[in-house]
Every structure is written in C-alpha cells, then in structure tokens.
Amino acid sequence: MGVNAVHWFRKGLRLHDNPALKECIQGADTIRCVYILDPWFAGSSNVGINRWRFLLQCLEDLDANLRKLNSRLFVIRGQPADVFPRLFKEWNITKLSIEYDSEPFGKERDAAIKKLATEAGVEVIVRISHTLYDLDKIIELNGGQPPLTYKRFQTLISKMEPLEIPVETITSEVIEKCTTPLSDDHDEKYGVPSLEELGFDTDGLSSAVWPGGETEALTRLERHLERKAWVANFERPRMNANSLLASPTGLSPYLRFGCLSCRLFYFKLTDLYKKVKRNSSPPLSLYGQLLWREFFYTAATNNPRFDKMEGNPICVQIPWDKNPEALAKWAEGRTGFPWIDAIMTQLRQEGWIHHLARHAVACFLTRGDLWISWEEGMKVFEELLLDADWSINAGSWMWLSCSSFFQQFFHCYCPVGFGRRTDPNGDYIRRYLPVLRGFPAKYIYDPWNAPEGIQKVAKCLIGINYPKPMVNHAEASRLNIERMKQIYQQLSRYRGLGLLASVPSNPNGNGGFMGYSTENIPGCSSSGSCSQGSGILHYTHGDSQQTHLLKQGRSSMGTGLSGGKRPSQEEDTQSIGPKVQRQSTN
C-alpha cells in the first residue's frame, strides 16, 4: 500500500512557508489538501458577510494555486470529528498534517482528531507556523505562567533561540511524483461554495476593499516593504486623515487568516532593515504588530476563559451596565458623535478600521462613556473585523477597557477632539457619514453646536436627520473614571496591593494629554485643555501593576462563572482584533 497523505487547512491558507504541508508531501504517493466547512455555522455564527467573503476568496485563491501544481483543494462539508473517520477509510489515508493551533478550543479539537487518527493507524504531523515562537516555551521560560506585560514578554523572547527561517514554497519541484487523485465531478463535490450557497443575501454588497488570498497577500507584502524602504529610520508614520483609510499595503487580515506567513514578514523586515541600516541589528520595535500578536496568543493559549470576564483569572471583575439600546447605537453608528459613528460605519462596510480608531470606539463603549462590557464590543468586532481573531480580539478589548494588562483608567479619548486633531477638515466624516457632508469643518465633529441656520444650509437638522449625542461626554467620563477608581481601590485592598500609585494627584487636570481645540465639546473644558477623561490614552506596561492579575481568579467584585460559548466553525478555522501594536502593518 502506498503513502496517502492529507493536509488539513484551517488557518495557514497558503503554500509558502507551510512546514506541515511540506513534510506531509515528502515521501507521499498521493496528497489531498482539505478544508472542512460546516455550512450550518454560516447562518448561525457571529461572523459577518465580509469575513465569510474574505475566507471564500482565500479558499478560491488556494485552489487556483494548487491547480498550477496539478492538484486541487477539497472543501468538505461537515464536522471534523465526523468527516475524518470517513476520509481515512475512503482514501486509505496513512498520513495527516496540520498547522499547530495555539487557541484552547483548537487544541481540544485537534487532540480529538489526533486520537481518531491514531486509532485508524494514521501518522499525524503537527508543525508551528501561525506564530513566530513556540508559545509553550515562552510560558516555560516564565515559570509556567504567561507573561502579562509586554516588557516581560520582550525580555523572554530575547532569551530564546533565533527564529527558524521560512521553509520553501510548495512548487512542482517539491511535489515531484506526489499526485492528487481527482474526479470529473470535483467541483460539484468539493468546490468552494459561494456566499449565496451559504445562505447570504448579496444584494447591495459592495466590492471587497480587502480581496482575500495568498496571491494578494504576497503582492501587498512587496508594496508594504517598498513603502518601508523610503522610511529609512523606520519611525512610526504620523497619523493623518489618509491613515484612517484602507491601505493597499495593509496586511493584518492576511496574517489573521494565514495567507501571509508571519515568519516570512519577519525575515523580510529584517533583511530590509539591514539593507537600509547597513547590517546593524534591528530593534524589537521593528516587529511591532508581530510581537503584540505573539504576546496575546501567549496570554490566551492556556486560558479557555480568555474571552470572558467571569472565570477569567487575568481579568478584573467590573460591574458593567447592561444597555442593549446603547450598545445597538454604538454598533450601528448612531451615537450622535460623528467621529465614533464614522468609524463604526467604515467597520461595517469594509471590515477594517485603523488601530487608533479601534482604541477610540473601544474606549467610548467601555470605560470612557457608555460603561458597557468589553465582551459586547468584542462580539461586534468578531462579527465585522476581517482581522479579528479569538486571542487578539479578546486581549485587546480587555486591555483597552482597563480590565487587564494595564490600569491607566484615568486616560480616555475625547470623541470629538481626537478626530478633529487627526483630520481637521473632516474628510473622513464626510466619506462615511454623507448626511453630514454639508457641515463646515468647524462643526463637523460637533454638529449639535452648529447654529440652526448652518444646519439648514447643510440640509441636516440635528435630532432629525442625524441624532443628538447619546451621552454627555464630560459627565459620563468623570463618573466612569470615579467608578474605575473605586473598583481598583477595592481590588487593591482585597489583594493587599498598592495599584493606584500612578493616579495623578490632580485628577481634574489634563495629565499631560495632547491638547485639542475644545470649545463647546461635550466633555471638554472651554479653556482649551481636555477635561478628565477627554485626552489621549497613555500606555504603560509596568510589571509591578500586573502581578495580582495572574492570581486573581475572582475578586470581591466577581459574580461567579458562566457557561462558555463554543467558537463558530469559521472562527475555529481562522483566527487581529483591535490593533495595539506600536508599528502597524496597515
């Protein structure tokens, strides 16, 4: 009997730097590449149409690239635990390869499949390629616990062995005599389905701003590196209006779905830096997004409650308000704050928003204005963000809501001033909220302050054509900062830790925030400085402030455990949430 191999694609939707697939092909007589899709999840899971479209485009591109190698992608409907025993028998499989999945549900799923494979006499190959590092080794280096500060994480990885270089791309030379058995009805039995076949209504669906697939990912990588090359000092680009728009060099969804290897990106960045800087060693900051990605993956890998507040040992238990009406206004871009609403509109239409825009809407929903749980925001991002995955989405929301990782809760974004500073003319607002297009720049971020005559000329009456602000930012932010302060004081007493040492002695000052023109902004003083809760966040990652979170479990604020929801199948198979990196790939 020959060696019949199957490679199971989940994330890692690519032929470059795919060590599990490469090893699976070696010595095999036949190879079949499969992707298991449960159509039931398309209608029931919390995943929007833009994300499903991106996934299907990734699968179509993968199939097209396999065709060039006289192979095909086999898209199989069903559940892995039901599908594989049948395939093992039907195809006489002797070898199965998979990319290692670090997320708790993925590890549980893969353990079950490995057991089925062993019982069927099938060899299983598992290789790490969705992350740069072996996360278990990072945790081992840290005494068996994940590092909960970025500084500590950087210290740990600096002690690890150099990264392995990407493996060669799967080509006809790599495949050699390994063939793929194909039938005439392959498309009918194993073809990539359409959105319509999955039950989606595509009427009015605009063309994709982010086309899915490995081919697009590699094209974007070259553009991204060309852009980097002229930024000889590799500093962070300055934020401006154009930064808010989707870029043809953006990479985050492609890293998320594994269309682009993080290792390839890492080594391309390294090579470029050495070329520009004449062989000097690159700083860790060069790899901003990649390392933040690893940081959150490491924090989440052994914590199945990472996406929950209750029962999550690293999450502060905060008594958030339940307010479905306010949540819907935020999610649908109806808050009455044009900056917030434009961001949420872009997210719903295109599936992507700039990482600082993510910070702004996350702060507004949680500790800044609405006092709604980060879990609710995380679910909306899970539905709409192309680059949202389980670990990074949950980790980012905990971080931005001051529920974990740092506690500078007295720093907030002003939902008027931050946008005005970024895009003074308001072009971004006009693009995504055309109802406000007629307002002059002076009033486009706070149209409720425009005289009635200007509103009439703009053909937009506030409260009729566009909503009034749903909250008074000044009052809400002051109240919420006080709430946070009380929670952390209680937690400090409960754990016997001095967590509030960094709270400014003058909480009504602007605390060194960037200044905005703040006249007549709800929540900002007329003196020209942002009031409490109205500035830019300052990020700190002091180790001493984090130690209690490792052991906390349930604080005195907790209310017990709640049942976990199984991730959707689409979420299982691909898994960057709100961007928190110092250097963006967008």
From Swiss-Prot:
Phosphorylation on Ser-247 by MAPK is important for the inhibition of CLOCK-BMAL1-mediated transcriptional activity. Phosphorylation by CSNK1E requires interaction with PER1 or PER2. Phosphorylation at Ser-71 and Ser-280 by AMPK decreases protein stability. Phosphorylation at Ser-568 exhibits a robust circadian rhythm with a peak at CT8, increases protein stability, prevents SCF(FBXL3)-mediated degradation and is antagonized by interaction with PRKDC. A motif (LIR 4) lies at residues 255-260. Its main location: cytoplasm. GO terms for cellular component: cytoplasm; nucleus. A motif (LIR 9) lies at residues 395-400. A motif (LIR 11) lies at residues 430-435. A motif (LIR 2) lies at residues 82-87. A motif (LIR 8) lies at residues 379-384. PROSITE patterns: PHR_CRY_ALPHA_BETA (PS51645). Pfam families: DNA_photolyase (PF00875), FAD_binding_7 (PF03441). One of its GO terms (biological process) is regulation of DNA damage checkpoint. Its cofactor is FAD; (6R)-5,10-methylene-5,6,7,8-tetrahydrofolate. A motif (LIR 6) lies at residues 285-290. A motif (LIR 1) lies at residues 50-54. A motif (LIR 10) lies at residues 411-416. Residues 3-132 form the Photolyase/cryptochrome alpha/beta domain. Residues 371-470 are annotated as: Required for inhibition of CLOCK-BMAL1-mediated transcription. The keyword Transferase does not apply. Binds 1 FAD per subunit. Only a minority of the protein molecules contain bound FAD. Contrary to the situation in photolyases, the FAD is bound in a shallow, surface-exposed pocket. Binds 1 5,10-methenyltetrahydrofolate (MTHF) non-covalently per subunit. FAD binds at S252, Q289, H355, D387, A388, D389. A motif (LIR 13) lies at residues 492-497. Component of the circadian core oscillator, which includes the CRY proteins, CLOCK or NPAS2, BMAL1 or BMAL2, CSNK1D and/or CSNK1E, TIMELESS, and the PER proteins. Interacts directly with TIMELESS. Interacts directly with PER1, PER2 and PER3; interaction with PER2 inhibits its ubiquitination and vice versa. Interacts with FBXL21. Interacts with FBXL3. Interacts with CLOCK-BMAL1 independently of PER2 and DNA. Interacts with HDAC1, HDAC2 and SIN3B. Interacts with nuclear receptors AR, NR1D1, NR3C1/GR, RORA and RORC; the interaction with at least NR3C1/GR is ligand dependent. Transcriptional repressor which forms a core component of the circadian clock. The circadian clock, an internal time-keeping system, regulates various physiological processes through the generation of approximately 24 hour circadian rhythms in gene expression, which are translated into rhythms in metabolism and behavior. It is derived from the Latin roots 'circa' (about) and 'diem' (day) and acts as an important regulator of a wide array of physiological functions including metabolism, sleep, body temperature, blood pressure, endocrine, immune, cardiovascular, and renal function. This is Cryptochrome-1. It comes from Macaca fascicularis (Crab-eating macaque).
